[in-house]
């Protein structure tokens, strides 16, 4: 049995990878779109590829980062890299309650450090112009619409995780690519609604570093990306448990 300390380090590394490459790709897209001038900080739907093409690129960046993390770290920690996934697994007794808080702390720290290191690589414009890939409801989308999108998106993510990674009947070796492509598809569809976070840690890292280095306060939106993903993950885990029960 791998020690809790080592598993938490693996969660830190996995969430670092997710935020550095995933959220970083969103920041780069906005920086390209802006031409060096700060536009609406939440509008990252128009960049080099234009509209949907940008979301496909961002989704694939997240998907590849997730797949790589799962294959590299899954045998160590399970590679949750998402507090909503950890809580979802706990809700159906697939993860011990005493380890939930340490996992979530490791995930939040990994996300914050990933966003910070991306800022050091890309420069201050990554925060002042690119927002470090922070998520927020898009113009015309209400608070509750964005939260509903996060519930639905995370429901799909979590039920996929239950089927391909948790269920012992699932074929071995496919979890990384299937989960990664699922996230890519969700981001492509929901990105222009809520930013498609699906993960409280993924949003936490950019929010914290944007506040510190760019003076941008987006925390009023944070409940969307905590409540929505957790509700979606728990509902999906309970649904899968019910559907597969005797």
From Swiss-Prot:
Residues 1-11, 77-103, 167-172, 239-246 are cytoplasmic. Pfam families: MIP. GO terms for molecular function: water channel activity. Coiled coil: none annotated. Keywords: Cell membrane, Membrane, Repeat, Transmembrane, Transmembrane helix, Transport. Disulfide bonds: none annotated. PROSITE patterns: MIP. InterPro entries: Aquaporin-like, Aquaporin_transptr, MIP, MIP_CS. A motif (NPA 2) lies at residues 199-201. It is found in: Cell membrane. The chain crosses the membrane at residues 12-32, 56-76, 104-124, 146-166, 173-193, 218-238. Residues 33-55, 125-145, 194-217 are extracellular. The keyword Coiled coil does not apply. It is a multi-pass membrane protein. A motif (NPA 1) lies at residues 82-84. One of its GO terms (cellular component) is plasma membrane. Channel that permits osmotically driven movement of water in both directions. It mediates rapid entry or exit of water in response to abrupt changes in osmolarity. Also exhibits a transient but reproducible increase in the initial glycerol flux. Aquaporins contain two tandem repeats each containing three membrane-spanning domains and a pore-forming loop with the signature motif Asn-Pro-Ala (NPA). Homotetramer. NCBIfam families: MIP (TIGR00861). Belongs to the MIP/aquaporin (TC 1.A.8) family. This is Aquaporin AqpM. It comes from Methanothermobacter marburgensis (strain ATCC BAA-927 / DSM 2133 / JCM 14651 / NBRC 100331 / OCM 82 / Marburg) (Methanobacterium thermoautotrophicum). The gene is aqpM.
